[in-house]
Amino acid sequence: MAVQQNKKSPSKRGMHRAHDFLTAPALAVEASTGEAHLRHHISPNGFYRGRKVVKTKGE
């Protein structure tokens, strides 16, 4: 097994883990329909920034 040469202090351990957290995805709300979608992506019904950009199956 590997053995550490020097013990890492709690402060250094915390600084090492500072970037290990998860971030929630940034959601945007479509102005025309009120649906939530990922930013810079179209909504499930084909709208992007208030305009219909993709035809859906129901149309």
From Swiss-Prot:
Species of the source: Chromobacterium violaceum (strain ATCC 12472 / DSM 30191 / JCM 1249 / CCUG 213 / NBRC 12614 / NCIMB 9131 / NCTC 9757 / MK)
- Asked whether the keyword Ribonucleoprotein is assigned, the reply is yes
Which cysteines are disulphide-bonded? Answer: none
Q: Which NCBIfam families match?
A: rpmF_bact
Q: Name one Pfam family in it.
A: Ribosomal_L32p
Per UniProt, which keywords does this protein have? Answer: Ribonucleoprotein, Ribosomal protein
Matching PANTHER family: 50S RIBOSOMAL PROTEIN L32, LARGE RIBOSOMAL SUBUNIT PROTEIN BL32
Family matches, as InterPro entries: Ribosomal_bL32, Ribosomal_bL32_bact, Ribosomal_zn-bd
Single Gene Ontology MF annotation: structural constituent of ribosome
Describe the family membership recorded for this protein in Swiss-Prot or TrEMBL. Belongs to the bacterial ribosomal protein bL32 family.
The cellular component terms of Gene Ontology attached to this UniProt record, alphabetical and capped at eight, are: large ribosomal subunit
Gene Ontology process terms (BP): translation
Q: What is this protein called?
A: Large ribosomal subunit protein bL32
